Amino acid sequence: MKKIVLVAGGTGGHFFPAVALGEELIKRKYEVHFITDLRCEKYINHDAGLIFHVIDLKRPKNILLFLPLLSLAIFKAIKLLFSLSPSAVVGFGGYPVVASMFAAIFLRVPIVIHEQNSYLGKVNRFFANFAKKIAISYKNTKNLPVVVKNRTVVTGGIVRKNIRGLDSVVKRRNDKDRTFKIFIFGGSQGAKLFSELIPESIKALMQKQPNLKLHITQQAALDDQVKIKNIYSNLNINYELAEFFDNMANQYKNTDLVISRAGASTIEELTYIGLPAIFIPLPSAADNHQYHNAKLLEDEKCGWCMKQDDISSEKLAEKIFELISNPKILENTSKNLLKRRKEGHKLLSNLIEELI
């Protein structure tokens, strides 16, 4: 049985797409090993059938301290890959993959990289020069070296299995008496900005349109929840608050509009099920990739991008009301999203099989 090694870590945005790819490769009778870091150890599910290994490497803060840590991590990765003798190594970007990718190059194992964002990150840009194939999620991905374009294939993003099980078409009902459901989330602990901005936006909206029927589901840190509860209770609207939502699929299927950051995994999941969103990109994201992701979708009429530096509760309230008042806009946006949908887990698996 041939072995494939997947390397992803740092955040769930890298980790979960790699797991979805691994599940598809296991179905195709490959032995799949998964190298991750300590931050993603909490996501490991041995029931998925993947064989996990942890080699930790964080983003460098001090280059003098980083080099010895990188050398140690590369040594561990070489030792592991030599023992496995894989047919290919697939990296998903970010600093946690660096050691394993260097090890694969040293051992002359074919490497493939997958870029989830619309802007090729620093790590993927470097390893693109050594990769047999570069899989991208967007045909207009920026920051691609010219010399690798003939090795680049659009496979689309990769979506978790439980999200792929949802109905692909989000149906819109032109019913003014219907409760409009908004789902708000912003990272593993909820974005502080969202806890302050969005309740004030809903308050401004309800003051101008008191007859609106809303249901708000919002991710928020525990410290922020009392204040948010008071605002929503005083507005007499239905709401649900949580620090973290385990079952995103269940939330998506009961939602009309999402307000979120613009990470690659979020965008791919919403694209797959045709669920429109207002994106507020995280300004501190590496290479400003969240802005590039959201702006590309906005340009293709697949969502709305509102920059954090420019947004206000009044502007957000106006945008929400515009969308509630015009269900046709949401319907068209949903259709545009579905046109972008790809079965990334299958297309990337095909690419790997062609390579080995």
Curated annotation (Swiss-Prot):
Compartments it resides in: Cell inner membrane
Keywords tagged on the record: Cell cycle, Cell division, Cell inner membrane, Cell membrane, Cell shape, Cell wall biogenesis/degradation, Glycosyltransferase, Membrane, Peptidoglycan synthesis, Transferase
Enzyme class: transferase
Pathway it works in: Cell wall biogenesis; peptidoglycan biosynthesis
Membrane topology listed for this record: Peripheral membrane protein
Annotated EC: 2.4.1.227
Single annotated GO MF: UDP-N-acetyl-D-glucosamine:N-acetylmuramoyl-L-alanyl-D-glutamyl-meso-2,6-diaminopimelyl-D-alanyl-D-alanine-diphosphoundecaprenol 4-beta-N-acetylglucosaminlytransferase activity
Catalytic activity, as annotated: di-trans,octa-cis-undecaprenyl diphospho-N-acetyl-alpha-D-muramoyl-L-alanyl-D-glutamyl-meso-2,6-diaminopimeloyl-D-alanyl-D-alanine + UDP-N-acetyl-alpha-D-glucosamine = di-trans,octa-cis-undecaprenyl diphospho-[N-acetyl-alpha-D-glucosaminyl-(1->4)]-N-acetyl-alpha-D-muramoyl-L-alanyl-D-glutamyl-meso-2,6-diaminopimeloyl-D-alanyl-D-alanine + UDP + H(+)
NCBIfam families: murG
Family: Belongs to the glycosyltransferase 28 family. MurG subfamily.
Function: Cell wall formation. Catalyzes the transfer of a GlcNAc subunit on undecaprenyl-pyrophosphoryl-MurNAc-pentapeptide (lipid intermediate I) to form undecaprenyl-pyrophosphoryl-MurNAc-(pentapeptide)GlcNAc (lipid intermediate II).
Protein name, as recorded: UDP-N-acetylglucosamine--N-acetylmuramyl-(pentapeptide) pyrophosphoryl-undecaprenol N-acetylglucosamine transferase
Species annotation: Rickettsia bellii (strain OSU 85-389)
